[in-house]
């Protein structure tokens, strides 16, 4: 039964990821006054399947001087971690109900750094290694603010479980009292998933393609799938933390529809940002985090800690 539940989670996530690539190409197309993919199937609807077939049928070439085992493990690990992160997410019921669900997601997202680092090192290429080091520095840096923002939210809900966060938001979304945190969280998730305007790991002008420059065919497709799965996952987490739907025991499907629509809306904003903004310079990227976001989030954390103590109150769900 567990295997059936697992497949019922993995297959829709993979399908969503496939059609997100199409949605992105269509969105960018229309924002640049062109059509986007429109040949394969009606209105280009079968384009993701054509891309998948093309990539997985091609021969996976690798550099002679590369470290074979790590070269193959890195993309597999990237996709595995991207899928494992979905397990504690309530949609409205999680696959595995973990007490420390929020902490689990934060810890698992940190592991994604290893796949990027290994891929850059195992490729035995200067460009790939520089791209990987950039990605690691960026991801580790922005995880600091993500963790502090999550701490502020957990101080409001009083529990590490995601289902408690849903209960906390029965009366009002946490987006309303903590909108500065939500804005910083959203920008940090853009940086965490290496998306524009923070896609410095893939700076074509200086790094050819970034950490995946030596990858082709299937392994490259796995990195690509992991990136888009992470995007949907981060937006799903944002929807759960800041804009959770009310969960009714009688109509759990209403929660699922509401949750899906919010995730789709946030994902579309990700694509919109990519079409609208140019890439940051690397020093600006780090300046934004260490000089702007970190002091602000620390101040907000102190505020959220002091407020319940000052009012002699406790969070609602403890």
Swiss-Prot record:
EC number: 7.1.1.2
GO molecular-function terms, A-Z: NADH dehydrogenase (ubiquinone) activity
InterPro entries: NADH_UbQ_OxRdtase_su1/FPO, NADH_UbQ_OxRdtase_su1_CS
Transmembrane spans: 2-22, 71-91, 98-118, 146-166, 171-191, 222-242, 253-273, 294-314
Keyword Translocase on entry: yes
Class of this enzyme: translocase
Main location: mitochondrion
GO cellular component: mitochondrial inner membrane
Reactions performed catalytically: a ubiquinone + NADH + 5 H(+)(in) = a ubiquinol + NAD(+) + 4 H(+)(out)
A Pfam family annotated for this UniProt entry: NADHdh
Cellular compartment(s): Mitochondrion inner membrane
A GO BP entry: aerobic respiration
Role, per record: Core subunit of the mitochondrial membrane respiratory chain NADH dehydrogenase (Complex I) that is believed to belong to the minimal assembly required for catalysis. Complex I functions in the transfer of electrons from NADH to the respiratory chain. The immediate electron acceptor for the enzyme is believed to be ubiquinone.
Family from the record: Belongs to the complex I subunit 1 family.
Name used for this protein in its record: NADH-ubiquinone oxidoreductase chain 1
Organism: Nycticebus coucang
């Amino acid at each position: 039964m567990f295997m059936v539940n697992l497949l019922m989670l993995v297959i829709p996530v993979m399908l969503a990821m496939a059609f997100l690539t199409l949605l992105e190409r269509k969105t960018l197309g229309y924002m640049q006054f062109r059509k986007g993919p429109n040949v394969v199937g009606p209105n280009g609807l079968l384009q993701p399947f054509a891309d998948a077939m093309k990539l997985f049928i091609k021969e996976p070439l690798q550099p002679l001087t590369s470290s074979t085992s790590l070269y193959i493990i890195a993309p597999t690990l990237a996709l595995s971690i991207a899928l494992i992160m979905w397990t504690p997410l309530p949609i409205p019921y999680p696959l595995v109900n973990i007490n420390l669900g929020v902490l689990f997601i934060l810890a698992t997202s940190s592991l994604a750094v290893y796949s990027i680092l290994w891929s850059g090192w195992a490729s035995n290429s200067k460009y790939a290694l520089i791209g990987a080091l950039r990605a690691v520095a960026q991801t580790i840096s922005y995880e600091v603010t993500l963790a502090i923002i999550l701490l502020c939210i957990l101080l409001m809900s009083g529990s590490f479980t995601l289902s408690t966060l849903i209960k906390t938001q029965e009366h009002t979304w946490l987006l309303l009292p903590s909108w500065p945190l939500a804005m910083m969280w959203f920008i940090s998730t853009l940086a965490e998933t290496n998306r524009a305007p923070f896609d410095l790991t893939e700076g074509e002008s200086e790094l050819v393609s970034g950490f995946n420059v030596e990858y082709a065919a299937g392994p490259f497709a796995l990195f690509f799938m992991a990136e888009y799965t992470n995007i949907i996952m981060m937006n799903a987490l944002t929807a759960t933390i800041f804009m959770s739907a009310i969960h009714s025991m009688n109509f759990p499907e209403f929660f699922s529809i509401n949750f899906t629509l919010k995730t789709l809306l946030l994902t579309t904003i990700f694509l919109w940002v990519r079409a609208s903004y140019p890439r940051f310079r690397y020093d600006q990227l780090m300046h934004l985090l260490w000089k702007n976001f970190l002091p602000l989030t620390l101040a907000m954390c102190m505020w959220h800690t002091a407020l319940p103590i000052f009012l002699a109150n406790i969070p609602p769900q403890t």
